[in-house]
Amino acid sequence: MRGCLQPARWLTTATLRRPLLSCPRQLPTRYNPFPRPFHHAPVLQARQPSKPLSLVEERIDAIPIERYRNFCIVAHVDHGKSTLSDRLLELTGTIKPGENKQVLDKLDVERERGITVKAQTCTMLYNHRGKDYLLHLIDTPGHVDFRTEVSRSYASCGGALLLVDASQGVQAQTVANFYLAFAQGLTLVPVINKVDLPSADPERALEQMKTTFELDVDKAVRVSAKTGLNVQELLPAIIESIPALLLVDSWYSTYKGVIILTRVFDGEVKAGDQLVSFATGLKYTVGEVGIMYPSQTPQSVLRAGQVGYIYFNPGMKRSQEAKIGDTFTKVGCESLVEPLPGFEEPKSMVFVAAYPVDSNDFHHLEESINQLLLNDRSVTMQKESSEALGAGFRLGFLGTLHCSVFEDRLRQEHGASIILTPPTVPCKVIWKDGKETIFTNPSRFPDEDTLRVKVAELQEPYVLATITFPEEYLGRVMELCEANRGEQVSMEFFTATQVILKYQLPLAQLVDDFFGKLKGSTKGYASIDYEESEWRKSNVVKLQLLVNKTPVDAVSRIVHSSQANRLGRQWVTKFKEHVERQMFEVIIQAAVGRNVLARETIKPYRKDVLAKLHASDITRRKKLLEKQKEGRKRLKAVDSAMVAIFLARVPVNNGGSKDLFVWVWMGVWIPRQL
């Protein structure tokens, strides 16, 4: 660094911020994230604490940056990450033993489903060989749909615990998360969990880790997170193996506005500091700083190397101001600081439309979605409208589980009443003039005439799927992949009984409950991970549902032509079961362009207008029947209103081991008066 001192900086995660230098000091070269020197920033007055330091803050103040450790836990779904986090918090005295369960799973949806959705952080203090160490633990999700949370967490860490279930061994998402961590250059500590189970086979799991990841398994720690067996051996391993030193989150408080989670790279930040955002150029006054211990614990200052939270006074009220990966520095030092590169923007793979049940709740729904976007920036949002459902939003997600969890959070945390359309995947249109357009909304897909005249090629997205399962189910899994238009890439037997199979699969097939079918075919023993692969030429069509020859745009889908007939027949059959009879005939059709693939008719109720008529009055009889006929025709064509748009949970048998469930939405035309 040529003897130059650096101005303080912070990086936010969902709204990552970093503090500016209050009292600049020279840091060791290995902690300098900048390739070239910067000039000295103006030295500000030393802080004058307004109240005595707490015991925790006194211990933190005495710890040099060389004894900071940032680490996370890398694992497959349900291999015990959150339980192990609880044991570590208990060992360090952060929480009381035996009184907590999955402390870092803070969302209701996480506790209900038993999975980790949001990466959560906690600061721990641990005395090792007579010296205090500051440990920042980040509990990360394991499911592929939340890979963005995982990658952001890895960016703020120096190392990770590679956790494997002793009874299940290495799984698909273990492999995927390992390569994410490896790409970030993290130091990995092998850990075998659940060694107390009767079905545990630690030697097999260690051999898989050695073969698959080429790790030194002699240093692996065998633990039981549930009972606490050998967990005390992990903390010394973390301190001795993980090197000393971008965290990634923000959330919303009704009273404080946006609260950001940040890692301080240089200098320090405290209440009263004036900060500026590199992303927006907006300036803020720090109202409070603190650490997660494990809940929000105020501190007088955050120093370089620490991970903590910041809120501003007055608060940041607009969630759009919070940019994941943003860099903050002190006002006046902007020219002396180079912002960090931030994070790679995730690409949405699955799209749904969201509409409020009551159109008057549109603005409340918009505000609720924006607040959730603060700490889940992998979701994309744009406004749209539907003739059937009115104003709403087109939301993009990383997968179907991601979508389902987001919906649950809207309902539980914000009390939103919403209607979601079936998930769809994007489609790329290559026009004859060479331009390309990606359509995420099926209702905007070109019609039949436009496709014939102006379109050169249609493409759909493919993914590279990695499937791990016992060898005995190999035939069933390959048959399932072939039935879903898959192309085999490779097959590897990494133990005598376990297979890793890689297939190129259309993303649309994965959205159509491929995972449920896979679990059914392997009795629940298979796991799958996938990554974006490429766009491929495909014969896709827009499948529409028509009610009385009027398209219901909210449920249209882009499907492969080979599936259009089957899906169309399923649609009309199941919709018929959930539409009540009316005073007029209801015709339900599934169509591709002008070609009607399937039709069901719901006969009307018969109102006997001749009941009180004398049998011999033929003229009067004809007149009443003609009047009834004209009335029904008028109701059906003009004088009818859409007064019921309902959500039905319809069982659809997809040929698996059990009935699967598909969410379907539909509009029904009902007369204003009979």
From Swiss-Prot:
Gene3D superfamilies: 3.30.70.240, Elongation factor 4, C-terminal domain, Elongation Factor G (Translational Gtpase), domain 3, P-loop containing nucleotide triphosphate hydrolases, Translation factors. The keyword Transferase does not apply. It is a peripheral membrane protein. This is Translation factor GUF1, mitochondrial. It catalyses: GTP + H2O = GDP + phosphate + H(+). One of its GO terms (molecular function) is mitochondrial ribosome binding. Its EC number is 3.6.5.-. One of its GO terms (cellular component) is mitochondrial inner membrane. Promotes mitochondrial protein synthesis. May act as a fidelity factor of the translation reaction, by catalyzing a one-codon backward translocation of tRNAs on improperly translocated ribosomes. Binds to mitochondrial ribosomes in a GTP-dependent manner.
